[in-house]
Amino acid sequence: MMTQIIHTEKAPAAIGPYVQAVDLGNLVLTSGQIPVNPATGEVPADIVAQARQSLENVKAIIEKAGLTAADIVKTTVFVKDLNDFAAVNAEYERFFKENNHPNFPARSCVEVARLPKDVGLEIEAIAVRK
């Protein structure tokens, strides 16, 4: 099996020794995406905008692999404050409905002590090529 490295300028560059995603043929696994705007390097101030930016970054990577957000089968959401859970959930639901996901992906959501660049959340995803 050949592993292909996925990279797009439409998502932030890796800030460490890792890649944006790997394509295993039938699976695409993204690295965690923090809410950095790839064009400006800016991080939105509020958690809802951060959730949207992280999801858009994941989407850009998945699309570079030739898939769509509707192909995402699993996500992991890391939040700095679990009190943001409801706000993140609402934006997460909006994103997947806008992107014609047939239901919603499986998901884990965990609170963590700290994230790179002191952002409020990070999202990673697994997509399946059907």
Curated annotation (Swiss-Prot):
The record's section on Pfam families has: Ribonuc_L-PSP
Similarity section: Belongs to the RutC family.
Which GO molecular function entries does the Swiss-Prot or TrEMBL record give?
A: deaminase activity
Q: Which domain of life is it from?
A: Bacteria
- The name under which this protein is listed is RutC family protein HI_0719
In terms of InterPro entries, this protein maps to:
RidA (IPR006056), RidA_CS (IPR019897), RutC-like_sf (IPR035959), YjgF/YER057c/UK114 (IPR006175)
Q: What is the lineage of its organism?
A: Bacteria, Pseudomonadati, Pseudomonadota, Gammaproteobacteria, Pasteurellales
Active site per UniProt = C109
Check the record and name the PROSITE patterns matching this protein. Answer: UPF0076
User: Which PANTHER family does its entry note?
Assistant: 2-IMINOBUTANOATE/2-IMINOPROPANOATE DEAMINASE RIDA, 2-IMINOBUTANOATE_2-IMINOPROPANOATE DEAMINASE
A cellular-component GO term for this protein: cytosol
How this chain assembles, per its entry, is: Homotrimer.
